[in-house]
Amino acid sequence: MATVSSCLLRRSRTASRIFKTSLRCFSTTSSSAQTVSGSSPFPFTGTNIKTNVSQLIGRTPLVYLSKISEGSGAYIAVKQEMMQPTASVKDRPALAMIEDAEKKGLISPGKTVLIEPTSGNMGISMAFMAAMKGYKMVLTMPSYTSMERRVVMRAFGADLILTDPDKGMGGTVKKANQLLDSTPDGFMLQQFNNPANTQVHFETTGPEIWEDTQGKVDIFVMGIGSGGTVSGVGRYLKSQNPNVKIYGVEPAESNILNGGKPGPHLITGNGVGFKPEILDMDVMDAVLEVKSDDAVKMARQLALQEGLLVGISSGANTIAALDLAKRPENKGKLIVTIHPSFGERYLSSALFKELREEAENMQPVPVE
């Protein structure tokens, strides 16, 4: 039975200092009797039946954008992380951070209350893992995020607290810390500070890209939220080939990594308004800026031209990749990016505003 492969670092719940580093890996194992959590040993050994849903995480495919990149001069391949169990790249770090804390004895199902600030997808992935493992989950989230996110989190049994949209992710983090201080047996995985968030991409996402491209990737470009993906993948690819270029992506309206100021934008999950502790600025060759409107338009274009129904951050990543593909120095190169989430999660957002209104106004036709 395959499991996600990851080597993780131990971190204190309250201190930002890493006080102990321990290497451990999820690995593919087989035994005479696979045990399903909370049940008797699984008797059907040798079958391709997974013993729990977490074993579905990882090994997402790369797809070439033949139409979008046509005439650009370079080749763009996109890793479809929307094909994870909860349709999001965040399934990887959610699993890694929870299992890392469990192995260190920091949390235990039925006792620990997990508390986490989120802009949406990480919260869904954590709620999914908490439901599977038996944890109570409390999430704080800015109220500007989509209705779909709220419903999915609640469907997994998580408690959800919405925060003032004008305070951005900073306000969401502050509220989560307040809840942590007042909750007995509360524990925060701290996605913005937890090195397991980065390391899981170093140990899984990066190697998958390297293997699937047979080491031919020239450029990797990725939107920056917590910074875990771009940092982990970037480190791995550069460890294999120092000449690989790594680019981050942030909203033009909230371009703090390029010296600007935080501000409202539509690229949910990116541009959190502060520099996360785990973000490795040194691994990136540059941070590109993408306007929200352009990201929305590209996400719509991907559905119509490539048959890929993706979210707004996927549109932003594709815009950035296309910009790089058009540069003369990148002619003939292979550019890899990621589609972090599935578009159906954005039905109530600006991405589908016109189509939603059109659908709402549809009238039935008579049938003779």
From Swiss-Prot:
Expressed in green and etiolated seedlings. It catalyses: O-acetyl-L-serine + hydrogen sulfide = L-cysteine + acetate; hydrogen cyanide + L-cysteine = 3-cyano-L-alanine + hydrogen sulfide + H(+). The keyword Transferase applies. GO terms for biological process: cyanide metabolic process; cysteine biosynthetic process from serine; cysteine metabolic process. Optimum pH is 10.0. Belongs to the cysteine synthase/cystathionine beta-synthase family. GO terms for cellular component: cytoplasm; mitochondrion. Keywords: Amino-acid biosynthesis, Cysteine biosynthesis, Lyase, Mitochondrion, Pyridoxal phosphate, Transferase, Transit peptide. This is Bifunctional L-3-cyanoalanine synthase/cysteine synthase, mitochondrial. Its EC number is 2.5.1.47, 4.4.1.9. It comes from the Eukaryota. Gene3D superfamilies: 3.40.50.1100. The cyanoalanine synthesis reaction is more efficient than the cysteine synthase activity. Probably involved in the detoxification of cyanide that arises from ethylene biosynthesis. Its cofactor is pyridoxal 5'-phosphate.
